[in-house]
């Protein structure tokens, strides 16, 4: 079989002079001249030397599992999917197609574009991709690149998994929650709806290879040789810079002025610093015009979308590229033209605390293997250069060897919902590469129980099954379902999309005019209604990009929200949930929307304790303030802060801020939250007040029922 597969590429891909009639076996069309040019580049990749042994292992592995270990830039992410496509083609597609998972949607999109180009095929036909709000596949697709969380959602849903001949789990060393869980499910053979002879290929950096070998029980392993050439010797700074962005900009300008050949890759901790660096460099490189074409400055982060392809395109007149990125490009996005690397040695990551149900933005050193992967970007003949904006002792003393598994740092409620959907009653029955903390699992189960997603036996309830269908956080999915009861589905669809998409506001207003335009979008009822108002104004503008720029809005995020809203609407129609007519702005709709939100977010309620905006969280007695971006704080003549608020998120990274906040009435909390939730609140004045309201409501209900009974008895007596 392997020898036959070799023939697909080696013999059907001759030079144009050797055969003008060679056709592509995937679509039956003659190869283009670009195919041969790219084929020569592919054959020069380090992974090409391992092609034959990989195909042998893929055919003969007793367990159906093959492990591939290779450094960033060796070509494994682009070539292995193509070889697997040849594998299923040689079988006449009798055993399904090839699915490749990626930990980041942007990586799935970028790889699909590149691989379709290398295979001389049309994107969306034989090669496609599936990422949030964008499914570029068709009936002819045999090679699909997919965000790993989407595949996990498919596996858990009633839609089934479809036929797959080969499943490739790429970039396993990134340790995403979905990738780790997919490996656990596959290892335990719990994907019963997949073909029995499914092939699984796990692709990783060498740093995680020993752990994966042990986890999978010693499967056949392909070790990709290192790139030719040596790695640069890193140059360290004596101390951490006071301003990372300025230090990185100065280093870039120095390299450009020295006319050192090659492109530059800059690693900074966050998207905010990436944007600041790109803005600063774009201004400063204009001074280099007298030395030739100014460098082209390009950001690379999850919000780039299809613009990511600019990092691969040739620049006009041979201008240098300066790519500014963060942890996203530690292992993904191989850029062969990079000769210089600037590494801040830091990353900004969200870390979830289950004890207080809060996220914090943690600035921390990257792992040692991440730092090594960054340095390898500049390997070659001769080696490039690597400037580390930190002392040599910084990582040696403070950095772990491997990246932290995301299963230790994320809210696991959605994960638990999927495990329950797979009928794994106990988390202990599922194998993890690294087991989550017990308190994180217990908090996730407790949250699902409060949301009525579990029955008395701890299995998914009927409501929980429906919740698991939605690509939303469980509490947001519950609020969306509650909107069916309260007749505000249209507004909740918009709100769910806006809360799930990237943030719509990119930055604070830069001038008085922009601030006034943005203030006009604020709604008196709070941030949730403001988000709905922003979306509706965006749609009324015709999704105009200039309209967004004038108000400091993220046009790409709003477009993403529009797509997601359409997906959610289609899903609700498919499972036959009731819809409602738009009624945004009416008094009744305002109350109904609050009730729907409280139905899902009763765990996220706070009370102003002293009338000054110091809010005490009901569930954990932490004190927090409203975010500076909250509409209640941005009003010119602020009244007394709302007494009771519902919030979307609580961050403990800076000043304990509540984000996306709206006022609610405590009576709604008593009416809609489970009674045992109120009973389990920690002792506080707020709990006593809510329990008093509950008793009054119970007494009122008893009196009303008694009055109705008396009236019925009187009516019977008259008869």
Curated annotation (Swiss-Prot):
Disulfide bonds: none annotated. GO terms for molecular function: ATP binding; ATP hydrolysis activity; helicase activity; RNA binding. Its main location: nucleus. Pfam families: HA2_C (PF21010), HA2_N (PF04408), OB_NTP_bind (PF07717). CDD domains: SF2_C_RHA. Residues 57-225 form the Helicase ATP-binding domain. SUPFAM superfamilies: P-loop containing nucleoside triphosphate hydrolases. Residues 248-449 form the Helicase C-terminal domain. One of its GO terms (cellular component) is spliceosomal complex. The keyword Nucleus applies. Residues 1-21, 694-719 are annotated as: Disordered. A motif (DEAQ box) lies at residues 170-173. The keyword Nucleotide-binding applies. It comes from the Eukaryota. Keywords: ATP-binding, Nucleotide-binding, Nucleus. It is found in: Nucleus. ATP binds at residues 70-77. Residues 8-20 have a biased composition (Acidic residues). Might be involved in RNA metabolism; it is missing helicase motif III and may not have helicase activity. This is ATP-dependent RNA helicase homolog DQX1. It comes from Bos taurus. The lineage of its organism: Eukaryota, Metazoa, Chordata, Craniata, Vertebrata.
């Amino acid at each position: 079989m392997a020898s036959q597969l070799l023939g697909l590429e080696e013999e059907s891909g001759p030079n144009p002079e050797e055969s003008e009639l060679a056709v592509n076996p995937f679509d039956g069309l003659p190869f283009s001249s670009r195919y041969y040019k790219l084929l020569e580049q592919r054959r020069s990749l380090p992974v090409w030397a391992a092609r034959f042994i990989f195909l042998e292992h893929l055919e003969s592995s007793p367990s159906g599992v093959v492990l591939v270990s290779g450094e960033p830039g060796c070509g494994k992410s682009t070539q292995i999917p193509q070889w697997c496509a040849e594998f299923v083609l040689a079988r006449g597609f009798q055993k399904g197609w090839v699915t490749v998972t990626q930990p980041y949607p942007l990586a799935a999109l970028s790889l699909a574009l590149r691989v379709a180009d290398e295979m001389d095929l049309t994107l969306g036909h034989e090669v496609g991709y599936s990422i949030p709000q964008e499914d570029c596949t068709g009936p002819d697709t045999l090679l699909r690149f997919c965000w790993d969380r989407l595949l996990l959602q498919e596996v858990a849903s009633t839609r089934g998994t479809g036929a797959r001949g080969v499943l490739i789990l790429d970039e396993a060393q990134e340790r995403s929650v979905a990738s780790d869980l997919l490996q656990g499910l596959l290892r335990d053979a719990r994907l019963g709806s997949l073909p029995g002879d499914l092939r699984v290929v796990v692709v990783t950096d060498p740093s995680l290879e020993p752990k994966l070998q042990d986890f999978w029980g010693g499967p056949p392993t392909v070790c990709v040789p290192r790139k030719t050439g040596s790695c640069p010797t890193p140059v360290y700074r004596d101390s951490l810079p006071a301003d990372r962005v300025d230090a990185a900009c100065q280093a870039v300008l120095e390299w450009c002025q020295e006319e050192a050949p090659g492109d530059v890759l800059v690693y900074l901790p966050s998207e905010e610093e990436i944007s600041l660096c790109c803005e600063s460099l774009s201004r400063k490189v204009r001074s280099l015009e007298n030395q030739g074409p100014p460098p082209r400055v390009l950001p690379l982060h999850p919000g780039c979308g299809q613009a990511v392809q600019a990092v691969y395109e040739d620049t006009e007149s041979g201008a240098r590229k300066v790519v500014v990125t963060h942890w996203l490009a530690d292992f993904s996005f191989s850029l062969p033209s990079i000769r210089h690397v600037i590494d801040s040695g830091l990353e900004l990551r969200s870390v979830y605390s289950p004890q207080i149900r809060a996220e914090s933005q943690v600035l921390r050193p990257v792992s040692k293997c991440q730092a090594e992967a960054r340095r390898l970007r500049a390997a070659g003949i001769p080696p490039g250069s690597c400037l580390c904006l930190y002392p040599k002792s910084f990582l040696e003393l403070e950095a772990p060897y491997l990246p932290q598994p995301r299963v230790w740092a994320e809210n696991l409620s959605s994960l638990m919902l999927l495990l329950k959907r797979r009928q794994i009653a106990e988390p202990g029955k599922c194998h993890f590469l690294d087991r989550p903390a017990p308190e994180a699992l217990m908090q996730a189960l407790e949250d699902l129980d409060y949301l009525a997603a579990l029955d008395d036996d701890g299995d998914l309830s009927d409501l929980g099954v429906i919740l698991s269908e939605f690509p939303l956080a469980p509490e947001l999915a519950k609020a969306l379902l509650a909107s069916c009861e309260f007749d505000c589905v249209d507004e909740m669809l918009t709100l769910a999309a806006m809360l799930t998409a990237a943030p719509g506001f990119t930055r604070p207003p830069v001038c008085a005019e922009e601030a006034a335009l943005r203030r006009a979008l604020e709604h008196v009822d709070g941030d949730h209604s403001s988000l709905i108002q922003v979306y509706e104004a965006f749609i009324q503008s015709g999704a105009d990009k200039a309209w967004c720029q004038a108000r400091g809005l993220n046009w790409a995020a709003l477009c993403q929200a529009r797509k997601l809203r359409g997906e959610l609407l289609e899903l609700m129609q498919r499972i036959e949930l009731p819809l409602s007519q738009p009624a945004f702005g009416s008094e009744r709709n305002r109350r109904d929307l609050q009730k729907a939100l409280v139905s899902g977010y009763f765990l996220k309620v706070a009370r102003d304790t002293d009338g000054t905006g110091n809010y005490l969280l009901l569930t954990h007695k932490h004190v927090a303030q409203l975010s500076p971006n909250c509409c209640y704080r941005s009003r010119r003549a602020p009244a007394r802060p709302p007494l009771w608020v519902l919030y979307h998120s609580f961050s403990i990274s800076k000043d304990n801020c509540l984000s996306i906040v709206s006022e609610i009435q405590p009576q709604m909390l008593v009416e809609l939250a489970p009674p045992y939730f109120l009973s389990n609140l920690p002792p506080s004045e707020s709990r006593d007040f809510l329990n008093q309201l509950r008793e009054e409501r119970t007494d009122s209900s008893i009196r009303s029922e008694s009055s109705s009974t008396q009236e019925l008895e009187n009516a019977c007596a008259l008869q």
